[in-house]
Amino acid sequence: MAAKEVLFGNDARVKMLAGVNVLANAVKVTLGPKGRNVVLDKSFGAPLITKDGVSVAKEIELEDKFENMGAQMVKEVASKANDAAGDGTTTATVLAQAIVTEGLKAVAAGMNPMDLKRGIDKAVVAAVAELKNLSQECADTNAIAQVGTISANSDETIGEIIATAMEKVGKEGVITVEEGQALENELDVVEGMQFDRGYLSPYFINKPETGSVELESPFILLVDKKVSNIRELLPILEGLAKTGKPLLIVAEDVEGEALATLVVNNMRGIVKVAAVKAPGFGDRRKAMLQDIAILTGGTVIAEEIGLELEKATLEDLGTAKRVIITKDDTTIIDGTGEQDQIQARVAQIKVQAEESTSDYDKEKLQERMAKLAGGVAVIKVGAATEVEMKEKKARVEDALHATRAAVEEGVVAGGGVALVRVASKIADVEVINEDQKHGVVIALRAMEAPLRQIATNAGEESSVVANNVKNGSGNYGYNAGNDTYGDMLEMGILDPTKVTRSALQFAASIAGLMITTEAMVGEVPQEAAGAPDMGGMGGMGGMGGMGGMM
């Protein structure tokens, strides 16, 4: 086992603080509408230019192992804030740095670290409760657009496109972000339920100009098995011929004689029909077939529940207003299922998603939920260069997370104002000694740090701005974007409550651990072994005769 180096007390804390400061100073320059860029070196390709706090934090590794421990702990703050709310990473880093700096000063002055931590924790609990009181619901499209704009570093086009996407697919809908091909951002909305399975035969195509199958008001047959014998389908096809309506078959597979007969019937115009494979595999396929059944008001024909295809009737079929099938995917528009059953299914999937421990499963469950709830929106990010594309895509993803957080827990005044107002209301938190009281004071001072940093990044004197804001009341604050003071909510400067709350809680949690650190243990660097002696190569002198090779 390698030898270890151990630092105690103040020596450990000084090293740790140095690491915290390196990381936090690199991250905090990105805060606010006038935040600066940070350029990240990449081992291949162009350097990455970003204003995303967590992207900067993830890149930082320090040579000194003890300083690096401090930096890694603050990196954890940024990562946790990002995981919980998808934004607020820079705010969390600034808060953590402020709490650690003041806390370590107090420890050096002889205060009890444990009591300081208790005081900080009490202040944070009171602050979170007060934030919830200040929070306002974020319901209308305009407020959602404003939240997105602020999170995307004041880019209004990003805020607006996210608000439009949410309006079209609903609050539960899936919104994904992709790299686009154009210079401008684009929004693609797939209404209805789409799954990635195309037609089983090109002979089903009835729209040659688009290479697709379009069925108006079709019946939909859902079968959880392979269909290869046409006799199983005859009762359904005979019933359909009388109605004159088209049929979509969704089955594990349709093959052989069954597929050939369907193609012939379709080409002769006897029955308008198309067949596709069911989406997914195994248990997920069964679940998705059930989703389609609920959406269209049909029943899944499955032998394991005692239903046979030969005995199926038109009552077992689902219906929809329209179905569009391309070679790659199928879209069912306006299924005629009962709305209360659809809502119950969405609620059931939501519970499964919350309980799931796998990110992949969670993502797939959310997709299923969105397809039932309203649709899927894809934001295609446009840019002139690859470097700009990557930077912009990261901002769009941040803004999307922030708007989801705003819809979930509401919004508070942005620009660091909410934390300043909270600090003024919780100054009299109950404590049992002077050291705890000082812990509360440390937390209250730290709550001003985001506002001060926004002002500093905008080129203003932070103390003057902080005083002006503290002298105001309610939502009165400083708009660094245009260097004015006023009501932050009226100016459209909003922060999601969840983002502000998460940033404060995670910053205080990690900072509290750092203040109460008394020793640090790291490996002693090993000297690299020297290269082997090349003395045995002396006999190579005889190579001189090689000159004749020229």
Swiss-Prot record:
Gene Ontology annotations for the cellular component aspect, listed alphabetically: cytoplasm
EC number: 5.6.1.7
Annotated compartments: Cytoplasm
PANTHER family: 60 KDA HEAT SHOCK PROTEIN, MITOCHONDRIAL
Stated role: Together with its co-chaperonin GroES, plays an essential role in assisting protein folding. The GroEL-GroES system forms a nano-cage that allows encapsulation of the non-native substrate proteins and provides a physical environment optimized to promote and accelerate protein folding.
Family: Belongs to the chaperonin (HSP60) family.
Name under which the protein is recorded: Chaperonin GroEL
Organism encoding this protein: Shewanella woodyi (strain ATCC 51908 / MS32)
